[in-house]
Structures are given as C-alpha cells and as structure tokens.
Amino acid sequence: MILVFGGTTEGKKVAGILEEAGYQFCYSTKTETDFQPGNYRFGAFTKESLADFCEEKNVQVIINASHPFAEGLHQTIYEAVDVPVLRFERSYPERLAHPLIHYLPSYPAAIEYLNTHPVSNLLALTGVQTIEKLKSYWSDHKTIFRILPRSVAIAEVSGFPAENLILEMPTDDLQHELSIIHQYNIDGIITKESGDSGFLFIKIAAAIHAGIPIIIITRPELPKTFFPVYDEEELLSQLNKILE
C-alpha cells in the first residue's frame, strides 16, 4: 500500500499518476475535500495514529504531496514512520533580489519588520491559519486577509473583523490582483513562498507593478530523510526501486 498525503494540486497529480500506473494507494487530507479518489480518508494524524495506520494497512512507502507549510504533518511523518518517504515537490520561482521583495524566515520576523517599516493597509495572502500568528500586528494595524470562502468560521474564532476579509480563491490573473490592491488602497503585501501552485509569481508581479513592498515568508526546510521527486518519471522510478 502507498499512502499519499495530498490536499494540493500536487496531490491530485500524484493520485492521477498512481491510478494510471495501477498502484494501490490511500489518499489522505487533513480536512474533507471534493477530490476523493478510490481509497480516501481525511483527518489529522497523530504520531501514534499514523504509525498504527501504516502498520494496519501495510504501508510500504509514503508520498508526501502536502502543502510546503504543513510543518506539523511533515514532522509527524518524520517521527512516526520508518518507511521511505518521497516528497513530490512543486516548482518555485527563483528568489529575486529586488528592493520591494523581502524574504523573511518567520511570522515574528515579519511582524518585527512591519513594525519598523509600517504600511497603512496590509494585504495578507498567507491563509486563514496565519490569522492567529499575525494577530499582534492586525490588532493595531489595518490588515485585509484574503481567505478561502470555506474558512470564514476559522477567521471568526480568531476575532478577525469580517469587513476586512476577501473571500475568494487565489488567482493567476495579474489584473485581478492589481484591482484588489487599488480597491483596498493596499500599500504592502505579506505572503508565503508557496511556489508556482500558489501563484507566488503573480503576487510578486502585482507588488512590483503597483510599486509596493511584498514580504515573503520562506518555506520551511523538510526533514533530510524525505527524498524529493519533481515529476512523473522520477516518482515512478523511485516507486519501482522501493516496491520491486
């Protein structure tokens, strides 16, 4: 059995590759999604429950195609299992040296930077799970969060003002991103290094086009034991080696 951690564009791609190749697999996401290939489960794993699941299902290899910022999951996989882990990586735009682009390693570092380089209206594109992480900033400074429509309840629990929410999916439409910047008088953006799948290149282009700074939280390092693969050929080659 192959266990796939998805919930991403990459996860869907992996599921399609495995189905076409005839591999038996279980597709797992943290929350229930509309994309549910044959053998599907959802819900967060603890170290203990993941270890039990892998033993019960005779999992021989894990394909981690989850979000690059799913740090809790990455650590759980690392600590819970001793089967091979393939990391199906997304592509990332090259980091750019530009006066408007600021790569920072953490949210505390971003808050510190914003406190010393204040903006009037910050557009946060870091996702609903980061509302709490940025609370010390938005409690005192105007911040607009764009989040998925299904995530409103999480924002409400955090006490974030509903009038400062934009409820929509990220887009690859530069003009749409610029229209948001102009509509809300945005003069600063914070986002994550989420790669091409997260349309990072569009967010950077929008900031540069509008002449406003963009803070990019750099993606966390993955455990060294995760073996990276970048396309279908590499994935199938590694699976053949592991499962032969």
Label for each model-derived stretch:
Residues 16, 26-47, 154-159:
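N-terminal beta-loop-helix "entrance" segment that forms/cooperates
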Residues 27-34, 88-94, 128-130, 147-153, ...:
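Short, polar loop motifs at secondary-structure junctions
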Residues 38-57, 166-176:
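Glycine-rich, highly charged phosphate/nucleotide-binding loops
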Residues 51-54, 61-109:
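Glycine/small-residue-rich loop that forms an oxyanion/phosphate-binding "nest" at active or ligand-binding sites
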Residues 125-166, 174:
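Anionic-ligand binding region
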Residues 156-180, 184, 188, 193-210, ...:
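A C-terminal functional module that forms or caps the active site or interfaces directly
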